[in-house]
């Protein structure tokens, strides 16, 4: 066990490092240019595509994918168990997860419970641990999302998904354990019905909700976590205690991608539906002005911030802080993102220049798993695994 003097030194060193980390080079940098098509040290590689056949029974939909990804899923589930056991070494928490969690969190809506049971069966991972893997994303998703509109009224949507803060640090290669273990699980999915694409999404194999996706020709949506005292833990506790009138945020994204038929319908659902965890829904459409950030607490919408190109608002940027508040000074990705977009100018916005913005530190950081670029109108959806070689901020 660390002595108090050593522990204090480590904590103080970390605080001092963080105080300066996001304010000076090499932790920040000038806006990147010419990073697209992706290459070089910040590009880990492409993300594979798989098809999910929604005509199959829910229990069987994920079998083909999970046969391939079961080994990688077992690695990350074991890491999650190790993190839990580090706090409660007796192993009692994991025993409760395996034995009690399915009963406590039973009656998931729609097809999700059967899908998770099917994943548990094919991977031979206990159902409780599959459920734990699925609810993790109610709490730890830290992201940057952008929607832009060019001079012709054409919309683009980009996002970095950052995940894994405080979930294990590998001192041998200076990376977050969970972040690195999610990269082999990252997949692009083509959800089909009657052999036709219904929607496309990027997710982690084993997770049946969605955080990033689009319905070709109609709308795109990404989810960012919103920090709040009345947060996801409270929502989960209410669910366990029997109050199940709210939706899991990853499941509501999956639901609108599967069932909604327009930008306005999706906007209405994401604005009014009760949810288990506070969130930001970043929604893009297919016409001028159809782009917004919906700031949510668990019961209602607090703000809808929309594109307004006629008055010069040709982009919206959302990280993990309310737009009317200053971001936490140790985690300001909003300011550099807006600065780089302003330097780019509306005339030059494209997949390439959005990728440049999302490749600029600290928008790109040690937590970044992947970058997605979406063009709803053209039906383009590109996902790239990322790296942030040292020197690089931890978040």
Curated annotation (Swiss-Prot):
One Gene Ontology biological process: sphingosine biosynthetic process
Disulfides per UniProt: 31-340, 388-392
Swiss-Prot/TrEMBL site (Important for catalytic activity) positions: 162, 320, 333
Signal among keywords: yes
One GO term describing the cellular component: extracellular space
Principal location: other
CDD domains tied to this protein: Ntn_AC_NAAA
Range of residues in the leader sequence: 1-20
Reactions performed catalytically: an N-acylsphing-4-enine + H2O = sphing-4-enine + a fatty acid; N-dodecanoylsphing-4-enine + H2O = dodecanoate + sphing-4-enine; N-tetradecanoylsphing-4-enine + H2O = tetradecanoate + sphing-4-enine; N-hexadecanoylsphing-4-enine + H2O = sphing-4-enine + hexadecanoate
Pfam families noted in UniProt: CBAH (PF02275), NAAA-beta (PF15508)
Function of the protein: Lysosomal ceramidase that hydrolyzes sphingolipid ceramides into sphingosine and free fatty acids at acidic pH. Ceramides, sphingosine, and its phosphorylated form sphingosine-1-phosphate are bioactive lipids that mediate cellular signaling pathways regulating several biological processes including cell proliferation, apoptosis and differentiation. Has a higher catalytic efficiency towards C12-ceramides versus other ceramides. Also catalyzes the reverse reaction allowing the synthesis of ceramides from fatty acids and sphingosine.
Subunit architecture: Heterodimer; disulfide-linked. The heterodimer is composed of the disulfide-linked alpha and beta chains produced by autocatalytic cleavage of the precursor.
UniProt-recorded name of the protein: Acid ceramidase
Organism of provenance: Bos taurus
């Amino acid at each position: 066990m660390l002595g108090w003097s050593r522990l204090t030194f480590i904590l103080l060193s970390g605080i001092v490092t963080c105080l300066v980390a996001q304010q000076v080079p090499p932790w920040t940098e000038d806006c990147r240019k010419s990073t697209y098509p992706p290459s070089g040290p910040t590009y880990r590689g492409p993300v594979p595509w798989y098809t999910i056949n929604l005509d199959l029974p829910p229990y069987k939909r994920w079998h083909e994918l999970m046969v391939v990804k079961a080994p990688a899923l077992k690695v990350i589930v074991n890491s999650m168990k190790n993190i839990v056991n580090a706090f409660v070494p007796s192993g009692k928490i994991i025993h409760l997860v395996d034995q009690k969690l399915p009963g406590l969190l039973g009656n998931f809506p729609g097809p999700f419970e059967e899908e998770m049971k099917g994943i548990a069966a094919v991977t031979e991972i206990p159902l409780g641990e599959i459920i734990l893997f699925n609810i993790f994303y109610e709490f730890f998703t830290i992201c940057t999302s952008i929607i832009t509109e060019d001079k012709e009224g054409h919309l683009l949507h980009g996002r970095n998904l950052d995940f894994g803060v405080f979930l294990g640090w590998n001192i041998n290669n200076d990376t977050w354990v969970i972040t690195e273990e999610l990269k082999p699980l990252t997949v692009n999915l083509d959800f089909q019905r009657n052999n036709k694409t219904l929607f496309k999404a990027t997710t982690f194999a084993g997770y049946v909700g969605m955080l990033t996706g689009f319905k070709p020709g109609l709308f795109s949506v990404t989810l960012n976590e919103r920090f709040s005292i009345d947060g996801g833990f409270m929502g989960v506790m209410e669910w366990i205690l029997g109050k199940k009138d709210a939706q899991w945020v990853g499941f509501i994204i999956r639901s609108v991608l599967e069932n909604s038929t327009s930008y306005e319908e999706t906007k209405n659902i994401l604005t009014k539906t009760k949810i288990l965890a506070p969130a930001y829904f970043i929604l893009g459409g297919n016409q001028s002005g159809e782009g917004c950030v919906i700031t949510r607490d668990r019961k209602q919408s607090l703000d809808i911030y929309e594109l307004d190109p006629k008055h010069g608002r040709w982009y919206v940027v959302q990280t993990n802080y309310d737009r009317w508040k200053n971001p936490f000074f140790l985690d300001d990705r909003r300011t550099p993102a807006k600065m780089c977009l302003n330097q780019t100018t509306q005339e030059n916005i494209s997949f390439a220049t959005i990728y440049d913005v999302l490749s600029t530190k600290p928008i790109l950081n040690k937590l970044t798993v992947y970058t997605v670029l979406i063009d709803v109108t053209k039906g383009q959806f590109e996902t790239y695994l990322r790296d942030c070689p040292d020197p690089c901020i931890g978040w």
